[in-house]
From Swiss-Prot:
InterPro entries: Ribosomal_uS2 (IPR001865), Ribosomal_uS2_arc (IPR023454), Ribosomal_uS2_CS (IPR018130), Ribosomal_uS2_euk/arc (IPR005707), Ribosomal_uS2_flav_dom_sf (IPR023591). Belongs to the universal ribosomal protein uS2 family. This is Small ribosomal subunit protein uS2. CDD domains: RPS2. GO terms for molecular function: structural constituent of ribosome. GO terms for cellular component: small ribosomal subunit. It holds the Pfam family Ribosomal_S2. The keyword Ribosomal protein applies. Signal peptide: none annotated. The keyword Ribosomal protein applies.
Length: 221
């Protein structure tokens, strides 16, 4: 496999471990699996991950940043997610997702995004449940063991490692900004900026969305 047409170099992808799955697989994720190693770990197809990353960023770029909510409860994803929100302006929920955030208008942090971006459909199950209830599309990072029936757009990846989640958020942020015409070839942030945040696992978990602007529900496209 060459680097041609990839969002980053193959070496960068492999060094981050985005292709390293788990020892479990589901039928939902079978199409994204390249092989199984001798130790039983399923390996994801890097080219398919790259393709889905590109398409996910293009899909998200149809939405204003204030109309997207990105969430995670995974410790190693908290820092990179906050950096993702900082550079894109997308609203983030890092840590506990308060029940009713999307479904209870009386809730203190009630929000009305048009699309939800998850780091893990199982760990972020409360946010996923509420997105299903209100009928908004869901983009999700999914590993080999995940069920994806309610994920509208799957990004197959190792969503547990510091390096892999940092690379995912960096690439999606970069492509989202490029697709919206906000940056050119000179990118004002780097993968290392995101990775640095992932290395700080003592970041305080914040259950409240970043308030860049009030969510406004728009007619479905």
């Amino acid at each position: 496999m060459s680097d041609e047409n990839l969002l980053t170099t193959l070496d960068t992808y492999l060094a981050s471990g985005i292709h390293i799955g788990t020892q479990q697989k589901t039928e939902d994720m079978r199409r994204f699996i390249y092989r199984v190693r001798a130790d039983g770990l399923y390996v994801l197809d890097v080219r398919k991950t790259d393709e889905r990353l590109r398409l996910a960023a293009k899909f998200l770029s149809n939405y204003e940043p204030e109309d997207i909510m990105a969430v995670t409860r995974r410790v190693y994803s908290v820092g990179p997610l906050k950096k993702f929100g900082q550079v894109t302006g997308i609203n983030t929920v890092a840590g506990r997702f308060v029940p009713g955030t999307l479904t209870n208008p009386s809730a203190k942090k009630f929000a009305e995004p048009e699309v939800l971006f998850l780091s893990d459909p199982r760990v972020d199950k409360q946010a996923l449940k509420e997105a299903i209830e209100i009928g908004i599309p869901v983009v999700g990072m999914c590993d080999t063991e995940h069920l994806t029936a309610h994920i509208d757009f799957i990004i197959p990846t190792n969503n547990k490692g510091r390096k892999s989640v940092s690379l995912m958020y960096y690439l999606i942020a970069r492509e989202y900004m490029k697709n919206r015409g906000l940056i050119g070839e000179e990118v004002p942030f780097t993968y290392d900026d995101f990775l640095e945040k992932a290395m700080n696992v003592k970041v305080k978990m914040n259950s409240a969305p970043r308030q860049r602007g009030r969510f406004q529900r728009r007619p479905r496209r």
